[in-house]
């Protein structure tokens, strides 16, 4: 049985990843899903075998993931938190660091701490004109994800790039 880790398991992309894993691997997939928000004791991420609540940057959350398994066939990273709604050019180093704290920085940490065959991160198109005026510091986090995708590492890197398209 292969282990699959989904960070951001309650969001649209994370829940879609869980459904796709189930559809492709069925009961042979052991899905561990992380979520963070207002804690709801007893809450289970739909389709996951194990639900881990917590901020992925917290060492206790990492230990909870390791307590299930240290070896994963696949990790899907679909969580983000950062400043949007202002022009990208107005993002300060502090806002970028705050955005990266959850939106990018945990990815290489997870790669180094766990044995993961492939990591797929989720990005969006952030360089089209109408996004440049509203994507704020988050654009830098998405850029970091895309640059990381091209780097070699312990795991295979991939990125799903989705979003709005210019017509």
Map each language-model feature to its residues.
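Conserved hydrophobic beta-strands of the Rossmann-like cofactor-binding core
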Residues: 3-6, 75-76
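Conserved glycine-rich Rossmann-like NAD(P)H-binding loop of the short-chain dehydrogenase/reductase
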Residues: 25-43
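Rossmann-fold cofactor-recognition segment
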Residues: 44-60
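Conserved NAD(P)H cofactor-binding loop of Rossmann-fold oxidoreductase domains
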Residues: 76-85, 123-124
């Amino acid at each position: 049985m292969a282990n699959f880790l989904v960070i951001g398991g309650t969001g649209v992309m994370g829940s879609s990843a869980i459904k796709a894993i189930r559809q492709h691997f069925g009961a042979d997939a052991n899905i561990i899903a992380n979520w963070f928000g207002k804690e709801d004791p007893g809450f289970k991420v739909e389709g996951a075998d194990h639900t881990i609540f917590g901020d992925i940057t917290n060492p206790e959350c990492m230990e909870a993931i390791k307590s299930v398994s240290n070896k994963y066939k696949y990790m899907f990273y679909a969580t983000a938190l950062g400043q949007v709604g202002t022009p990208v050019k107005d993002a300060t180093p502090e806002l970028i660091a705050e955005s990266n704290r959850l939106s990018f920085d945990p990815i290489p940490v997870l790669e180094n701490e766990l044995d993961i065959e492939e990591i797929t991160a989720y990005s969006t198109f952030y360089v089209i004109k109408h996004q440049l005026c509203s994507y704020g510091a988050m654009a830098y986090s998405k850029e970091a994800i895309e640059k990381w995708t091209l780097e070699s590492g312990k795991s295979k890197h991939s990125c799903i790039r989705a979003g709005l398209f210019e017509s």
